[in-house]
Amino acid sequence: MKFYNREKELNYLKTYCQLDPNSILFVYGPKSSGKSTVMRRVIKELEDSNIVFFYYNLRKYATYSKEEFLRVFFEKSEKKYLLNKLELNLGVFKFGVEENFDFNNLKLNDVFAKINESINAVVEDGKKPVLIIDELQKLKNIYFNGGKSLLNELFNLFVSLTKMEHLCHVICLTSDTLFIEEIYQSSTLENTSKYYLIDWLRKGTIRNILKEEGFSEEEINYCLDYLSLPYEIVDLIENKKLGLSVEETIRQWINIEKDKIKYLIDTTDLDEEELYKVLSKFKDKIKISYEKEVKKEEMKYFKFLIKNEILFYDVINGIIKPTSVKKWYAIREILK
């Protein structure tokens, strides 16, 4: 997919990667807002620098077990770190372990020792290590010997690598905002983390893209009320080439989103009336304040809609809104 203008986000992340490590960075935002695309662009633009990127895209795998985690993160080799064969075009690395390393009888301390060895090897080579994990929350339900949570222990390791030893940047990407809320409230990560939002595309950016792609001023003005995510622009451009007007494409989007929301509500055991009551808060405005407009007894309905990606909870700024502008229009139509 074509990379669209994200200079502000690119500059922030490129600069962050070149600073001395001092915190864990959580990059969050609505689903499909372009987090992974921006991060991959950062890696490409810094490929000639002295940075060694360890990049793990966990969205490629449906479920995770202890064994799968080890297979994804490590590779047997004489080297302490080596190119990731699954991401050769990106030039990123994996942690290396010796050929006779026994994956079947591992303790968590053994795993962390190998991660530390790889990172220290990069530093000894005069380079800067940056560890990036995309959709980190997929590791939530993995436990090692003694019932230790992999994710909780990883956070302790990340704090050590960044805040304490200043050895390695750790950047975690996620669209799971309930997961971000857990992290934000965690005492373990207090004063050790930064949060960066990659949100909807700005209207000026959308206008420039559509103009560059040959859309008329009338078409652009119509689209600006509905577009917010990069993939929507791609879909709009493709559909125009296939003979669909922008009005037809956008109407299709809203109808599909409306049906998805209705089906979700129709098939849950939660109180239908209460769910619609929560959605009605968005009838006349696209975002609400969590502090001022969400009651305690409504939280389970909000969490259900957030978990199912109808709503997006920006925990850092205390805002709840639909995951996209087209989703907002679908909500409003359902409420008619």
Swiss-Prot record:
One MF annotation (Gene Ontology) recorded for this entry: ATP binding
InterPro entries: AAA+_ATPase, Archaeal_ATPase_domain, ATPase_dom, MJ1010-like_2nd, P-loop_NTPase, WH-like_DNA-bd_sf
Pfam families: ATPase_2, MJ1010-like_2nd
Binding positions for ATP per the UniProt entry: 29-36
Keywords, sorted A to Z: ATP-binding, Nucleotide-binding
SUPFAM superfamilies, alphabetized: P-loop containing nucleoside triphosphate hydrolases
Family in the record: Belongs to the archaeal ATPase family.
Listed name of the protein: Uncharacterized ATP-binding protein MJ0625
Gene source species: Methanocaldococcus jannaschii (strain ATCC 43067 / DSM 2661 / JAL-1 / JCM 10045 / NBRC 100440) (Methanococcus jannaschii)
